[in-house]
C-alpha cells in the first residue's frame, strides 16, 4: 500500500515505537494535546515540542496541513503507523490522528532524541 501524500519521510519501526513511548511518558508525567484540532492549536502557538501523526488517517486532508505547519514553526514531527495505537498511547479509547507533546515530563530526553533523529531523516 502506498504511503499517503502527507507522509514526507520513512520512519523506522523502532523510532515509531519510541515516539509512542514518549507520548505515554508525556501523558503520565507531562502534558499532551490529543486530536488534530488541539495539535494544530499547539503548533500554531509554538507550544508543541514534538508532533506525532498517524499514517493511516482517512481522509488525508484531516492531517495534511500538519507537516508544512510544523516545518514553518520549526517543530519536529514524526509518523506512527496506526491512529489506533496513537490513541491508546495518548490514553484515550478512540483512535487519534495526531498528538502534540507540550510538556514531555520524564520523557524529555526521549523527545529530544526523537527530535534529533527526525531532523536527520528530513534532510
Curated annotation (Swiss-Prot):
GO terms for molecular function: ribonuclease P activity; rRNA binding; structural constituent of ribosome. Keywords: Cytoplasm, Ribonucleoprotein, Ribosomal protein, RNA-binding, rRNA-binding, tRNA processing. The keyword Cell inner membrane does not apply. One of its GO terms (biological process) is ribosome biogenesis. It is found in: Cytoplasm. It holds the Pfam family Ribosomal_L7Ae. SUPFAM superfamilies: L30e-like (SSF55315). Gene3D superfamilies: 3.30.1330.30. Its main location: cytoplasm. One of its GO terms (cellular component) is cytoplasm. Signal peptide: none annotated. Part of the 50S ribosomal subunit. Probably part of the RNase P complex. HAMAP family: Ribosomal_eL8. Multifunctional RNA-binding protein that recognizes the K-turn motif in ribosomal RNA, the RNA component of RNase P, box H/ACA, box C/D and box C'/D' sRNAs. Belongs to the eukaryotic ribosomal protein eL8 family. PANTHER family: RIBOSOMAL PROTEIN L7AE FAMILY MEMBER. This is Large ribosomal subunit protein eL8.
Amino acid at each position: 500500500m502506498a504511503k499517503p501524500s502527507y507522509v514526507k519521510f520513512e520512519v523506522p519501526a523502532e523510532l515509531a515505537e519510541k515516539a509512542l513511548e514518549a507520548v505515554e511518558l508525556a501523558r503520565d508525567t507531562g502534558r499532551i494535546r490529543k486530536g488534530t484540532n488541539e495539535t494544530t492549536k499547539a503548533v500554531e502557538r509554538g507550544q508543541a515540542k514534538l508532533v506525532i501523526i498517524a499514517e493511516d488517517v482517512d481522509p488525508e486532508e484531516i492531517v495534511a496541513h500538519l507537516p508544512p505547519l510544523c516545518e514553518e514553526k520549526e517543530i519536529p514531527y514524526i509518523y506512527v503507523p496506526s491512529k489506533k495505537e496513537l490513541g491508546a498511547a495518548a490514553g484515550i479509547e478512540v483512535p487519534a490522528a495526531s498528538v502534540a507533546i507540550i510538556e514531555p515530563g520524564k520523557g524529555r530526553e526521549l523527545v529530544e532524541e526523537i527530535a534529533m533523529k527526525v531532523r536527520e531523516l528530513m534532510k
